[in-house]
Each structure stands twice: as C-alpha cells, then as structure tokens.
C-alpha cells in the first residue's frame, strides 16, 4: 500500500516522541516527508529543456584571472570559508571510520592534504581561511579525535553535524526507531542538500557572517581536485552570483552524472532520476548534454541564511529505498546541487577536468598513487609527461577492492604514464618498478596465483599466465 498524506499525523506523533532528534531536525524531517507524500515532485517537461548559454555556464578560460597582487588575494581569501562534506564512511573501500582518513599518497590522508593546502594559503597571504567539516552521526566521534592532531596548524577547524533523520518502515510508514530500532541502523543522514539548514542550525553560519565572510566553497572530501580557486571566487563577488556550480565536460564514465539545463528562464540541475524513461539514452549522450556536476559548489552565505529562514530550499526529493536487517525501509534525501534554482543570479562554470579527481575506489587510488601525479604542498598535480588529456581506464577485480589488500598486491605502484587501459581479474600480484603501457589485461585463471615480476615492461598485452610475459 502506497503511503499518503493520511499517514502524516501518525508519523508526526511518533517523531515527537524521538528524544534523539532536535526540534529543528523534527520539523525538517516532517517537512521533507509531507512534501514527499503530497507528491510535489517536480515533473520536467522535456520540450522545455534548453542548453545553457555561456552567460549561464561560463567557460573557465573566459574568467579574468586574479592578479599577482598579494593584497588583492588576501582580500579575496578573507571572504572565504572552505567546507568539506565529511559524512561518508570508508566502508566500500574496506576501511572503518570516516573516508577522509584513508591514506591517499605519501602517508597523507584526504584530510591531511586539505589542511596542508589551506595552511599554505593562510601562511602565504596572512589570511585566516577556516576549514569546516560537515560530519554525519557516523563520522562525528571519530572526526573529533582526528582533528586534534591539527591543533598546532595555522587553520581554524570547525565541525558540525548534519541532521539525523529516522528511517521509515515502508509498509507501516512509521519511524523505525519508534519500533525499537534504536541503534545506528535506525537512522540516516539525509544527503548533502542538508548542508544549508544544518550549517545554519549549527550557529556556524552566523559566526562566519559576523567575521565578514561572504562565500562558502563546498566540496566532497574525496575530490582531490577541489582546491580553492581565486579566479572563480573573484568572478562571483564581482558579478554578485549567489551560487555557482562547477561542471566539467562529460566522458563516457560520467554519463549518469547530473547536468545543468536552462528551464523556464532559470538554471537548474537535471539528474538521471528525473528523466522520463524514454529520454534516458538521450540524457546519457555526450552530444546533447555535454557537462556534468562535479559537486564543487560556491555559495553566498547571506543568501543561504535568507533562503533557510524563509524555508525556501525545497530541493527535489530523492527516495532511497533500502533493505536493512530484512526490513524494507525508506530514506528521503536531497542534493546540494539541486538548490541552484533557488538562488539569484546562479551560474555554472565549466572547469578543467583537473578540478574533478574523486577517489571512490581502489582503481582511483592506483591513479593518484602512480607517476601520473605528483604531490606538492598538498596539491595533487598531473604529470606533464602524460600527453593524453584523459586518464587511463582502470578496472580491478574484487581481490583489489579493499585498500589493505589492494596495497598488499603491489610491491610498488606501476608506472602508468603511457597506459591507456588496465583490466585485472583473479589472484594477481605485482612486483616493483613495473611499467604498463597501452592496453593491458591481466586475468589469472581460477585457483592460479599470477605474479608480474619486478621491472617487467608490459605493453599492449593480454596476460593469462607466466608464459604470456
């Protein structure tokens, strides 16, 4: 039986009894559920979709670069807050605790690199750019302990929690914790669209406004390309853009990513979930929808305050049905990128691919730990010796999924500057100082351990056993 608005009073009284939630969380949750039940999902009329112009999605190279003047740079940085989304766990990569504490390169974690980058800016320009981490209840305790190690760094680190909402038991439409599910599994963080109300409710937003801050740069903590960019910041301040989403050209790997469209005179995010079935292939085409959302967002702090106070941020709801411990539950989420249509003078900026370097799997770790990149001052920079603008495609079998097993299977990370693609399956082990070039496939037969020897140079080969080396 589908839930209707008639289920709302029962749900509301159950939520009132949940002492683990703050009043603002209760009202936020009820508001989200009532919007969902009233079916106010915004339907996209396909014929009204237009490709955004260069005024709406500005090419990065058309923006005026910032001068080398130290005073101008300091003035810009004094208006900035950097916020990293830190709610995710490293479970998919076989790690416990926050994903941001996975070691990326040279013994440094995502969080280490972020702190080093901001500290370098603060030291160089004599400014005080703060770092804010939005945690979830899954990462809050661990993060508090972890940030203690940065006490002596020249970065003010703030943390706050995003909202904690109860999962809803699908068939009865009641909060799971009300039925006795009191452990963490009964709850969920409602997506990063929650960043705006959560920042406001934490009191941090008012603190930053009182310090003269104007913009927050929001990014995923696992995107190594999401570094402070003064050219973008200067453009937004000069043009009074309340919101800016960084987009970048799609490749075949990104066909499911959200894109920016012009719709009824406003810029809007279009996600694959909103696309009618008959248009999904068109949505995935690189010809019509050429860009996708990197989730690097720049947002004016006063505008966030105004919109949150007016309860105006009614982003598209993403229903996320799950089965947990044999119970079918529903969690309702929103995405920060979908907020773009509520801000005045919102734009996209079409940035180089280098600003999108996410580490979602061990195959991404292989890229960033290899000679394809170098690490300088906390910045991961691409090796100029690589002539191909796109990265090699890398597919590693389940034996490499967890970070610890991935690392144990490489004596050292191979050279991949001249690699086009790598596909590895089965019980494969790599020696040290190996060079991979062109298209390489390594597939160990079932039950067979296949070792690639030290200093092997493998170019355009299919390897199924030692005899193929």
From Swiss-Prot:
GO terms for biological process: callose deposition in cell wall; cellular response to phosphate starvation; pollen development; sucrose metabolic process; UDP-alpha-D-glucose metabolic process. UTP binds at residues 85-88, 99, 162, 191, 222, 360. The lineage of its organism: Eukaryota, Viridiplantae, Streptophyta, Embryophyta, Tracheophyta. PANTHER family: PTHR43511. Its EC number is 2.7.7.9. Belongs to the UDPGP type 1 family. Induction: By sucrose. It holds the Pfam family UDPGP. Converts glucose 1-phosphate to UDP-glucose, which is the major glycosyl donor for polysaccharides. Acts redundantly with UGP1 and is essential for the synthesis of sucrose, starch and cell wall, and callose deposition. It is found in: Cytoplasm. One of its GO terms (cellular component) is plasma membrane. Expressed in cauline leaves, flowers and siliques. It catalyses: alpha-D-glucose 1-phosphate + UTP + H(+) = UDP-alpha-D-glucose + diphosphate. One of its GO terms (molecular function) is UTP:glucose-1-phosphate uridylyltransferase activity. It comes from the Eukaryota. The gene is UGP2. InterPro entries: Nucleotide-diphossugar_trans (IPR029044), UDPGP_fam (IPR002618), UDPGP_trans (IPR016267). Keywords: Acetylation, Cytoplasm, Nucleotidyltransferase, Transferase. Substrate binds at residues 87-88, 192, 220-222. Its main location: cytoplasm. It is an enzyme of class 2 (transferase). The modification N-acetylalanine is found at residue 2. It comes from Arabidopsis thaliana. This is UTP--glucose-1-phosphate uridylyltransferase 2. Disruption phenotype: Reduced number of seeds. The double mutants upg1 and ugp2 display severe growth defects and male sterility due to the absence of callose deposition around microspores.
